[in-house]
Amino acid sequence: MAVDQSSFVVLDGHHRVEAARAIGLRRIPAIILDYSSEKIVVTPHSISKEDVIRAALEGRKFPPKTTKHMISLEGHLFHISRIEPDVRLDIRALR
């Protein structure tokens, strides 16, 4: 799961959040990102980062797969999940 460091808006991993809630987890491993970084890009370009944050803070959800969050690494764009580490924890630690 990827989360903006300023607003704590979930950028990637919404389905994981819903699954975690459904099984009663109180904690969810996440990577905290500086969404204002120029290295992070939202597509399509018709939706801005500000649109994403504003919609989330107002409780408005975009339909699934409306946006993709990409990160520029060494001149190439990759889905943000590329930098999310594998997390292997005993699920009991998250309750």
Feature-to-residue mapping (PLM):
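Amphipathic, charge-rich alpha-helical segments that serve as recognition/docking helices
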Residues: 35-76
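Glycine-rich, aromatic-bearing surface loops/beta-hairpins
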Residues: 82-95
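A short, basic-hydrophobic beta/loop patch
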Residues: 1-9, 14-46
